[in-house]
Amino acid sequence: IAFLWSIVNSPTFPNTVEKNYCNLPKECLVKKKFWGFLPEHHVFHLYNGRKNRKLFDEGIHALADVPEDKLSNAQQVIQLNCAKTGKIHIDKEKIKEFLTTLDKVECHLDFETCSFALPEFNGTRPYQRLPFQFSLHVINNGTKKHFEYLHDGKDDPRPTFLAALKEMLPLDGSVVVYSQGFETSVLRELARDFPEYASWVNGVLKRIVDLRVPFSNFWYYNPIQHGSASIKKVLP
């Protein structure tokens, strides 16, 4: 507390602070004041870079200036080359191999959830993710169909969410999601809380294909991603 008060009462900004905290829990209002000197592709963008701060302290600010012997994985090598050339990296063979894992029918699925500090419904826990909406695009033989569900009411959305998903989701085909950890964990919680759906949910889980894989492995990488495979960076 004393340290914080010293900053508040100081007529000048403190020295540059640890960048890892500048976006938590949300982006700092004076982030650009501290870090505006960094180039567009800077060392803190290095993918999975546990030594980013050390590199910065050694005077390495630009990503293109990072020595190759400081890199620790294949993604960093790709990222460094893209930073130097400004070109997009595409591994067509790896992407083709990934696409062969998709079934003839593709079910592209996305959930939206809400959570409450104080549980709203019986049998739920604080901050438990409760799905209330889904978007489903089904591709079959070149044709596309869109299905959706949005809960309308103040009651527990999960029973009707599950019923609608079971009705609209095809019985076979790949269930394609982006960053599968979210959807799979929500589905597992639903199977636990609604055991009558457990067998069906477990069948869906076995069909999930994670579209994030080609991007997290940098089989496709654009320098504007800044070392991230999040959908917010990939989608544009």
Stretch-by-stretch model annotation:
Residues 17-18, 23, 27-29, 108, ...:
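A structural signal for short, well-ordered beta-strand segments and their strand-loop junctions
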Residues 10-42:
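Cysteine-cluster motifs in flexible loop/terminal segments that predominantly coordinate metals
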Residues 1-2, 146-236:
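Conserved DEDDh/DEDDy metal-dependent 3′-5′ exonuclease domain
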Residues 42, 46-105:
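N-terminal accessory regions of nucleic-acid-interacting proteins
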Residues 1-12:
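Internal, well-ordered domain-core segments that constitute the primary functional module
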Residues 33, 111-114, 139-141, 180-182, ...:
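An acidic- and aromatic-residue-enriched active-site/binding cleft used to recognize and process polar
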Residues 94-171, 192:
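Conserved RNase H-like, two-metal-ion catalytic cores of nucleic-acid enzymes
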